[in-house]
Curated annotation (Swiss-Prot):
UniProtKB keywords: Malaria, Repeat, RNA-binding
InterPro entries (alphabetical): Nucleotide-bd_a/b_plait_sf, RBD_domain_sf, RRM_dom
Disordered as annotated region, ranges: 253-279
Database matches in Pfam families: RRM_1
GO MF, one annotated term: RNA binding
Xref: CDD domains: RRM_SF (cd00590)
Top-level taxon in the UniProt lineage: Eukaryota
Domain (RRM): residue spans on this chain: 16-106, 342-435
Disulfide feature: none
Record SMART domains: RRM
Name the record gives this protein: Clustered-asparagine-rich protein
Residue ranges with Low complexity bias: 256-277
Length: 443
């Protein structure tokens, strides 16, 4: 079917994902969702926006910035219709580049008979004492500013779909393409005979702290990321979490107490099922359509000061959950009870916190088990410095502190994703430091 269209099927499965390139700078992710949503139902969208500030630093002051997006449709026919009519849907007259769309192909490394367990490690045992985030020592800073989204450097972590598949038979070489935000990737590893350890495949960070003790035992690192749908945990005969929630078979509370029942039909990956407290997706059609219809109300989304993207809902069992209007994901309230209290106790006894501990505060104290928020902020979490989180006279943490980022976009994203987040019976208030302008990066 549709043999004339390249990659319209992947291993016999109809492709529903489109990789759209050369999106004009005036077309935001909200506009793109609205335009394409008129043609077909959009299940998911990843919008990769290049910052003008970053481009200016690379002497591209007079160059237009064209963006890229990965869009997942409900059916193959809808994706095909958009692909054929993309130039009519999005006006690119007067632009330097013509918009281009093609079926997306998973960027999968095929390493037959290779049991390398470090294939998807984002940070690989970097010593925080010697780490310079602005350089390439972490394979982060230099690649974040890179314009080459199709190169062989680690920027492939942000460009998940290209037509290059590596055929690497070297068992000693580490593949750093972690597919950081691959969403709903079904049949991704059908040709891969590896029996990789899932806890390492889904590891977002593997830092070596000052005491050289790795974070491999941190519960957060062994949990599947909400954007990483590792379909090794589901077979073709089992319903996924989204379908079960949509059909009313499970609630947010049910997610945590009965998560082991999801994988009863899978005999290949039973060793990590207890760590699958995944942030469930809210796929109800009315919520998605509501998001697409509210184009005008979301046009000012970049004005993030004081904006809360979290809304409180109740399911049919009167269980409270929280829905994020931007990421279209929801959190069950009892997930917050999984906080690592031993880590909190240790931090309360400390008189001050250094850079490593502040990073650990974000990843463990606030969002331990909350891979949703951690994934949102980890892409921009490049902290330059911080001030101590002060405590009151009674010895209780006031929850007050300053964190500085290396660029404006990172600070704005931190505000956008964290402000209004419900944790420890309070709503986080994240905003620019008083007296600071948008040019400054304190939040």
């Amino acid at each position: 079917m549709n043999n004339e269209i390249v990659n319209s099927t992947i291993d016999g499965v109809l492709n529903t994902k489109l990789h759209i390139q050369n999106i004009p700078p005036h077309i935001t992710d909200v506009h793109l969702r609205s335009l394409l949503g008129n043609v077909g139902f959009i299940k998911d969208i990843c919008y990769f926006n290049k910052s003008k500030k970053q481009m200016n630093n690379n002497n591209f002051a007079n160059k237009k910035i064209y963006n890229t997006a990965l869009v997942t449709f409900n059916t193959h026919e809808e994706a095909l219709n958009v692909l054929k009519n993309i130039k009519n849907l999005i006006d690119t007259s007067g632009e330097e580049r013509n918009i281009d769309a093609k079926f997306a192909v998973p960027n999968v490394s095929i390493n037959n008979n290779n049991n390398n367990n470090n294939s998807n490690t984002f940070f690989q045992k970097n010593n925080m004492n010697n780490t310079n985030f602005s350089q390439g020592s972490t394979n982060y800073g230099s690649n974040y500013n890179s314009e080459n989204f199709q190169g062989n450097n680690n920027m492939n972590n942000y460009n998940f779909y290209n037509n290059n598949s590596s055929n690497n038979n070297n068992n000693n070489q580490t593949n750093t393409q972690n597919n950081f935000m691959n969403r709903n990737m079904k049949n991704k590893n059908m040709n891969n005979n590896n029996n990789n350890n899932n806890s390492n495949n889904n590891m977002m960070m593997n830092m070596n702290f000052n005491n050289n003790q790795q974070m491999n035992n941190n519960p957060m690192l062994n949990q599947n990321n909400f954007m990483l749908n590792n379909n090794n945990n589901y077979n073709n005969n089992a319903k996924n979490v989204n379908d079960m929630y949509r059909d009313g078979e499970m609630s947010p509370n049910h997610l945590n107490n009965n998560n082991n029942n999801i994988n009863n039909n899978n005999n290949n990956n039973n060793n990590n099922n207890n760590n699958n407290n995944v942030m469930f997706r809210q796929n109800n059609s009315h919520l998605a359509q509501m998001y697409q219809a509210n184009d005008n109300s979301l046009e000012d989304v970049e004005n993030v000061d004081g904006l809360s993207l979290w809304e409180m809902y109740k399911d049919k069992n009167n269980n409270i959950f929280y829905y994020n209007n931007l990421t279209k994901h929801a959190n069950g309230i009892n997930l917050f009870t999984q906080t690592n209290y031993s880590s909190i106790t240790i931090m309360k006894k400390q008189n001050k916190m250094d850079l490593v501990e502040v990073t650990y505060l974000f990843s463990t104290y606030l969002v331990n088990g909350q891979t949703l928020i951690y994934s949102n902020i980890s892409v921009v979490l490049v902290i330059l410095y911080h001030q101590k989180f002060k405590e009151t006279v009674l010895g209780r943490n006031s929850g007050f502190g300053f964190v500085s980022y290396d660029n404006v976009i990172s600070a704005q994203h931190a505000i956008q994703f964290m402000n209004g987040y419900f944790v420890n019976n309070k709503y986080l208030k994240v905003q620019l430091k008083k007296g600071e302008t948008v040019e400054n990066t304190n939040s």
